[in-house]
């Protein structure tokens, strides 16, 4: 059985880890970095770039460089949060036929799971390069507050990337695993404050040690799936745009190139202000008008940054209060606070968390790597490599069905430990009703329409009877991934209908299979592209070395020996500019064959040069003069 890798699929950055012996290990990518930007770019020559290479070219290709895709995964185009992103993202967010939020790249509509799969493929390849074997299984993390549609979409992304997702686990829970695995402190209750690039979670987790077995039990979780570092960046960008408009009278919002440069500069300034009190944002030639080029140079202080984002930090504290209340705990009962996610490096965030909990957060957890490490530990548990660890997670949102009057009747309360199963008996609302529609909902509101619709199905063939007489048993079953299965059974006839909840939108199995095939086809195209580049490089090297030899020893060849070599060099040079690898290989072989006499002449010249050098050194050896020396001792 191969290794089960752990992947933190982040909004801004992603990370992959694996159990190396009995210790989890974060794996460096091809660029030598421990985290990979969750950025995907589609270039003009149909190449797909992922990670740092995609980030580097973002300024010149803003419309086809996709980032923060996790904010769209499993969401409807009409969602308020998606509409906010539509207004600020440089790439085009569009409405899919099923109502989902998709992205349009070069006129082609793409689903968020399809795009996220590119990042997962990069993580898979990173792990394979390290392990030296094929990887087919993974544990992938999601924000604790992700709903069913978002979890399903993340699983779909894994399938498209060629991974069997063995488990979806919540990010704060994974961080707790990373923190608590080697802590021999017995029982303790911790709060995990996870403020990442696009999402925020707060989980209260109890770590118990009984007879050598560690149990990680989530008591409560809460969060905001549209609050994170990207929102902090946008505040900085908007401030810079407004200041520039005041100074220069030019609105940069209409210039995608300038906005992409501002995004990079804004993120860099925000990071610098975690350690410095002020920074300069300096972008020469940001734009131009009739009077000439314009330069942006704005000072940004830490105090100004904190004023810009104060309400975002305050917004993160609301779910903290709710989670504590749901867990039935007071602040004083929390033993440790762990910070996860890059945005928690901001001093204001650390200060507000410390003020709320009345204690300094822990500094011994890497906020960028803890989640991937925890996922790798869970992978080790599933593979049987890690013993004596039990993970008890919860469902973040209540689940129920719509009943008469448009009310949501809850079957499974939020923060119920999963996996779980719950049944309840309902009846008909009309006389002689022969079918019922089971409308499955997720959320905390009593009004059904105010909650997230997860899907609906019909139970037909109910025997005619007065209203309220038939007994229909509805059963909710949530698996360890937090994925929901619902069944409805007519106790009178024994007829039963079951579904695994597919988001009321979501991707169909056919669409996922097509995307898997596309991904495999792309992998083949990528392999061919790599082979073509290698062939071109070999051709360039051969052209260069042959021309060098011609310049050095060409006069020793006759004109009839020299002409075919020069002709073959020119033909190879032309072939190397084309797209046909077979032709390049053929021209390489042709040049090697006609260059035989040139190679001989070159070798003869090298031998002659070596002989001359040796005789010179022998001659020089006769001139060696013996010198007398006197040893001087320290007095």
Curated annotation (Swiss-Prot):
Residues 600-617 have a biased composition (Low complexity). Keywords: ATP-binding, Chaperone, Nucleotide-binding, Phosphoprotein, Stress response. The modification Phosphothreonine is found at residue 199. InterPro entries: ATPase_NBD (IPR043129), Chaperone_DnaK (IPR012725), Heat_shock_70_CS (IPR018181), HSP70_C_sf (IPR029048), HSP70_peptide-bd_sf (IPR029047), Hsp_70_fam (IPR013126). Acts as a chaperone. This is Chaperone protein DnaK. GO terms for molecular function: ATP binding; ATP-dependent protein folding chaperone; unfolded protein binding. Induction: By stress conditions e.g. heat shock. It comes from Histophilus somni (strain 129Pt) (Haemophilus somnus). The lineage of its organism: Bacteria, Pseudomonadati, Pseudomonadota, Gammaproteobacteria, Pasteurellales. Belongs to the heat shock protein 70 family. HAMAP family: DnaK (MF_00332). It comes from the Bacteria.
